[in-house]
Amino acid sequence: APRPTQSAVPQRVESASTESVPAETADPNRLPLWLTWTIAGLCIVLLGLLAAHYLMQAYLTTRAEEWETARQNTLSYYHVVEGENGNSITYQPLIERYAAEYNLRPAFVAAIIRNESSFRTDAESSVGARGLMQLMPDTAEWIAGKIGDSNYSFDHLYDAETNIRYGCWYLNYLSKLFRGDAVLVSSAYHAGQTTVTRWLSDKGISSDGVTIPVDKLPDGPTKQYAGRVTTSYGIYEALLYPNESAEAAGAAAGDIVSARAVRAGVANQ
């Protein structure tokens, strides 16, 4: 049989290369997977902390604004004005002058004025009390006789100085009767000394016959009044006389007599 002839063009037989394809060379700058995940986790935590920080800042800013609004409302309610030399109130020079003359704490006088007239010289009640400290006609006339004011007229009580002078004299009178106790003096200023004396004799109201805590006062307008006055007293001490620690301590104890008077031994003259 004829043998097949070989192709004139010899076939090129390519043998498979015995060389292996080298593996991809690792990037020396590439972080390990575990480290990448760790950094990602830390970033998430950091973002959470930053978010919490800004939320807290926003919360604190809001609270600070609320606090400042409340503070300004308090100052306005108590007629306190802020200044470079500290806080002040309307008629403060007159209040301090006659408080000193009659051995009273000026903060207590201010508390009475705030709750009687809200610092209005033209205030007049339905029962005829008049002026800053709301003095009744018969009481004012009696005081005029005691201090020797021969020119007294009831219309003079619209005058701030006259009203504060008369009111401070009367507070001093009540202070001597009730040992400078803020609750008793404010109660007597509102309801009369006879009423307070009667309460002191009632063991159900006063356990010692000398003092009456506000919460033991009989329910009614006088109890509410005494509570407001004593609260205002403490606030005026804090706002107007924060550095007078000895006097402020007296206010905290409910004493309306000035520390100067106590030191001089004339509180109950």
Go through the PLM ranges and name each one.
Residues 56-269:
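Catalytic glycan-binding domains that act on GlcNAc-containing polysaccharides
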Residues 5, 27-30, 60, 192:
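Intrinsically disordered, low-complexity regions enriched in Ser/Pro/Gly/Gln/His and often acidic
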Residues 2, 11, 29, 259-262:
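Short, intrinsically disordered low-complexity segments
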Residues 1-21:
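N-terminal targeting leaders characterized by basic, low-complexity, disordered sequences
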Residues 37-54:
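Hydrophobic membrane-insertion alpha-helices, especially the h-region
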Residues 16-17, 21-22, 43, 48:
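Extracellular cell-wall/glycan-interacting regions and their flexible linkers
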Residues 22-35:
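Short, Lys/Arg-rich cytosolic juxtamembrane segment immediately N-terminal
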